[in-house]
Amino acid sequence: MSLIPVVVEQTNRGERSYDIYSRLLKDRIVFLGHPINDELSNLIIAQLLFLEAEDPDKDIHLYINSPGGSVTAALAMYDTIQYIKPDVATICMGQAASAGALLLASGTKGKRYALPNARVMIHQPAGGVQGKATEAEIHIKELLRLRERLNEILSKHTGKSVEQISKDVEQDYFMTAEEALEYGIIDEVITKNELKDK
């Protein structure tokens, strides 16, 4: 069961209550705090598109604490981040693993952050196949194609070669915030309130 806090705000018309995510959205903050699936991806995409429509010139802050999840759902969010006009600052708190790491790296260059105790993990996509051999072969080819595409995206955002990324993602590759900075997934390790000044 998921409990969502409610925030009460005083306005000139009286009190107004918001669920915490709606209140954060008012400040152009989107929070990705679950495993990534199609439903979550659609919610995040809708928030990004709403914020772009509201003010296409003002930054959006995407906070990430996710173990990863569906590659196709993550790619839908990735494409949206690249598509919209506002800069998207990405901030890892806790973890950005697998597809979460891809989204962390996809933020606007110079605006990708992690808190000091955050961890980042990259690896190749995983999948399972059942059924006829011909169907299994189709799914394996698609998985290999997705792996290559993910490696190309990480290469684009980190500055590492596709060959280096391919080697690194053969197994789970864990990084501290400082190591993610050295790798090129983030641009800065931040601490208390530093982001508000940027």
UniProtKB/Swiss-Prot annotation:
Family: Belongs to the peptidase S14 family.
Hydrolase found in the keyword field: yes
Main location: cytoplasm
Gene: clpP
Main function: Cleaves peptides in various proteins in a process that requires ATP hydrolysis. Has a chymotrypsin-like activity. Plays a major role in the degradation of misfolded proteins.
Quaternary assembly: Fourteen ClpP subunits assemble into 2 heptameric rings which stack back to back to give a disk-like structure with a central cavity, resembling the structure of eukaryotic proteasomes.
One term under GO cellular component: cytoplasm
GO molecular function: ATP-dependent peptidase activity; ATPase binding; serine-type endopeptidase activity
Cellular compartment(s): Cytoplasm
Protein name according to UniProt: ATP-dependent Clp protease proteolytic subunit
Phylogenetic classification of the source organism: Bacteria, Bacillati, Bacillota, Clostridia, Halanaerobiales
Listed Pfam families: CLP_protease (PF00574)
GO biological process: protein quality control for misfolded or incompletely synthesized proteins
